[in-house]
């Protein structure tokens, strides 16, 4: 028999009775679903039942007619324009049945309607055949036209909610399909099965989905199906799990609730986690993730030799107190807050970076940090937090940046039309932007080097409030009042400070979205992938890979009073964080459930600081004091706007340091490119480090260290481990056969800096 555990958490797998019985049972269930749907077709197609908004509009969406690639395009197609994804039914009704003398519908002979003949490809149609004659789609449109293509009665019940079942499914091989069902609820309380009317979209190619909602596996993995009916959409998450007949849960130990939630899901997926990483891998990973630099050879040796069972917890505690922690996390926020010299100028960049770093050094709660940014005004020199508004110079840009950075919400689409993949409307967009309309600037001084660049400022500015500034809706020009995003509770009508009310609402413990977005960002920086991915794209149709884990982390973050260090410690002391990156046979396909560590390339700053640290030689940058590490550079001017950048500046740009023009993690690139290969193999930066007259190589030669000592030191400095016997033998052989000993040592160091193990965080 088949075991089905509730409708919202469906797990289907064959028991001891075998595959045939299970498949037979599943086919019966599927057949029954199809028969039920077919039985409904005559009912929903009756002319007296067909409505424009609840029947015709969904058909147009399902056929793709109002998509952005078709007639929902800004300019329409073939002279026929519909509102994008049906956001304006009244306009679409006019276009279909009234405009151009009603040429698209034939009220006396519905079969001859252009709307039907084009869609069935009875006549030429650039979009091809969208449905067949006699199909549900055809019959629905036919009956509506035959009834006179009427508008809906004003008393028509409105769509209020959409439910999809099952919401989550785990299908164990050989079970390879699941039938989704969509149920709509209307304002009069009626419910209707709309499975045949909804649009099904897949998040990836691991499965296929039919027009009737049958999801079938292509390969193992997890897929999200977005189910859309009119303006509402809901996700269904499905996992296709290999049979793994010999699977046995390994009962891994849990250090905290993170492990418990991760293990709960892994067990359902029949996936054992990888073992813990060895000590050398762990210390290198922890140093890079928590403070952005490599451990020194002495630090790495001491940690590996330490026999205390709590040494990993001790290490994390020590790293949290180091000054490099402040530099590392200030760098991340400087990227997101657009701390760059073109708009802020060099003095403003230094002030803003200093304020960010000081906030982290004093362990200011993240909620207070964001509150200070949202409410900031005055001189951008004297009150550096005001540079948030100096960088974002219009109400719409401020609203988009605030929503994306602090609420994990991408609002940009709703500027021009209702968001196609989220619940946000144009009203939501411009109501939220209205909070930021009063912000204005008093420019005390401006001496730009390029007077034609209207976004270049050099000189002091004041961020001030001007109550006369307004945001108007593009459709009709009505003045918008400030409104919180997705919250029935709205700011009180008053002459008070709207930004203060926004900051209080946003950072309140009741606003779980803020806390979830921030802890997801912290998780991403430590785990290399967000629980919600992309990390700033929270929406119902992009669900978290582990919802209970994200909820638990959100609660813990709020309970800690938004303590960054407490959350870093919580994550890094979990066994989930400490797992090896090498997958097992069970989890080699896993890309979202944290069964093993994810490998990624070091960031530009990490790479350059690691090279500098491994060779104990400084890198030169323009515009900062000698001895600065890459992670300590406040801005980006020398990297992106200096006519003669230093080698270190060019290196950072080549390896993906962002220009800080947008408020998004996505601006930083960790992609590989051919130019990076050339830079690492023969670039000016690596050559300067290798040949520096007082680097680690020169120091060891002065101290007359023997070959074994030199080889050991280089390996510990670059890879945080001792060389294997094979590696030691190869290095000693090289040194024995070179004329110049320093050149040979440089070759060994060059090889280590170009090794995958060096350039990757494992």
Give the positions of each predicted feature.
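Cysteine-centered motifs
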Residues: 2, 22, 32-33
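Short, positively charged and aromatic/hydrophobic N-terminal segments
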Residues: 3-4, 13, 19
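Periplasmic/extracellular electron-transfer cofactor-ligation site
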Residues: 61-84, 143, 147-156, 410-426, ...
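Long, His/Glu/Asp-enriched segments that create or flank divalent metal/ion-associated functional microenvironments
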Residues: 615-641, 645-674, 678-679
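Primarily short, surface-exposed interaction patches in extracytoplasmic proteins
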Residues: 250-324, 332-623, 666-667, 687-745, ...
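Bacterial N-terminal signal peptides
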Residues: 30-42
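Short sequence/structural segments immediately N-terminal
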Residues: 51-67, 151, 157, 319-326, ...
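Solvent-exposed helix-loop boundary motif
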Residues: 47-139, 155-183, 191-255, 280, ...
């Amino acid at each position: 028999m088949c075991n089905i555990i509730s409708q919202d958490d469906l797990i289907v797998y064959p028991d001891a009775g075998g595959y045939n019985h299970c498949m037979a049972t599943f086919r019966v269930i599927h057949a029954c679903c199809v028969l039920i749907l077919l039985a409904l077709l005559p009912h929903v197609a009756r002319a007296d039942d067909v409505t424009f908004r609840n029947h015709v509009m969904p058909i147009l969406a399902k056929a793709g007619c109002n998509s952005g690639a078709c007639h929902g395009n800004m300019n329409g197609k073939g002279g026929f324009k519909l509102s994008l994804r049906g956001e304006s039914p009244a306009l679409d009704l006019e276009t279909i049945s009234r405009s151009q003398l009603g040429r698209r519908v034939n009220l006396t002979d519905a079969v001859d309607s252009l709307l039907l003949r084009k869609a069935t490809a009875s006549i030429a149609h650039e979009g091809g055949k969208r449905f067949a004659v006699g199909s549900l789609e055809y019959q629905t449109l036919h009956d509506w036209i035959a009834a006179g293509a009427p508008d809906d009665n004003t008393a028509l019940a409105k769509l209020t909610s959409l439910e999809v079942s099952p919401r989550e499914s785990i299908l164990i091989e050989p079970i390879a399909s699941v039938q989704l069902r969509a149920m709509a609820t209307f304002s009069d309380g009626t419910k209707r099965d709309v499975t045949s009317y909804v649009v099904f979209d897949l998040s990836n190619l691991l499965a296929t989905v039919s027009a009737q909602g049958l999801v079938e596996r292509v390969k193992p993995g997890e897929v999200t199906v977005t189910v859309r009916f009119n303006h509402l959409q809901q996700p269904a998450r499905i996992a296709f799990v290999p049979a793994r007949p010999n699977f046995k849960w390994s009962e891994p130990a849990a250090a905290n609730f993170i492990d418990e939630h991760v293990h709960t899901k892994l067990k359902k997926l029949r996936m054992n986690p990888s073992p813990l990483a060895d000590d050398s891998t762990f210390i290198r990973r922890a140093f890079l993730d928590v403070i952005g630099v490599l451990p020194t050879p002495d630090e790495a040796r001491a940690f590996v030799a330490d026999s205390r069972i709590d040494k990993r917890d001790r290490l994390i505690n020590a790293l949290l107190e180091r000054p490099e922690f402040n530099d590392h996390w200030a760098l991340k926020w400087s990227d997101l807050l657009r701390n760059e010299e073109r708009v802020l100028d060099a003095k403003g960049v230094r002030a803003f970076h200093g304020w960010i770093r000081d906030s982290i050094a004093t362990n200011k709660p993240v909620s207070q940090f964001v509150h200070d940014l949202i409410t900031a005004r005055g001189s951008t020199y004297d009150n550096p937090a005001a540079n948030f508004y100096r960088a974002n110079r219009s109400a719409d840009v401020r609203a988009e940046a605030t929503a994306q950075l602090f609420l994990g919400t991408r609002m940009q689409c709703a500027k021009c039309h209702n968001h196609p993949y989220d619940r946000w409307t144009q009203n939501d967009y411009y109501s939220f932007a209205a909070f930021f309309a009063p912000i204005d600037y008093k420019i005390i001084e401006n001496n730009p080097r390029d007077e034609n660049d209207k976004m270049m400022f050099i000189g002091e500015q004041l961020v001030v409030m001007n109550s006369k500034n307004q945001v108007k809706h593009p459709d009709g020009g009505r003045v918008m009042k400030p409104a919180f995003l997705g919250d029935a509770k709205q700011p009180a009508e008053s002459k008070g400070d709207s930004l203060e009310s926004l900051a209080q609402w946003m950072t309140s413990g009741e606003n779980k979205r803020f806390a979830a977005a921030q802890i997801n960002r912290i998780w991403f920086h430590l785990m290399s992938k967000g629980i919600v991915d992309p990390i700033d794209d929270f929406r119902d149709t992009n669900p978290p890979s582990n919802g209970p884990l994200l909820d638990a982390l959100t609660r813990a973050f709020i309970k800690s009073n938004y303590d960054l260090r407490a959350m870093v410690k919580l994550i890094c002391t979990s066994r989930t964080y400490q797992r090896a990156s090498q997958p097992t046979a069970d989890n080699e396909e896993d890309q979202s459930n944290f069964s093993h560590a994810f490998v990624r390339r070091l960031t530009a700053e990490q790479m350059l600081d690691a090279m500098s640290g491994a060779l104990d030689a400084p890198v030169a940058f323009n515009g900062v004091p000698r001895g600065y590490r890459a992670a300590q550079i406040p801005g980006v001017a020398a990297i992106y706007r200096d006519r003669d950048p230093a080698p270190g500046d060019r290196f950072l740009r080549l390896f993906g340091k962002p220009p800080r023009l947008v408020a998004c993690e996505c601006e930083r690139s960790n992609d590989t490119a051919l130019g990076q290969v050339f830079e690492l193999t023969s670039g000016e930066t690596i050559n300067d480090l290798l040949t520096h007259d007082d680097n680690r190589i020169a120091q060891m030669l002065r101290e007359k260290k023997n070959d074994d000592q030199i080889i050991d030191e280089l390996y510990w400095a670059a890879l945080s481990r001792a060389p294997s016997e094979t590696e030691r033998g190869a290095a000693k052989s090289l040194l024995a056969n070179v004329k110049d000993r320093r050149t040979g040592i440089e070759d060994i160091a060059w090889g280590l800096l170009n090794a995958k193990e060096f350039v990757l965080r494992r």
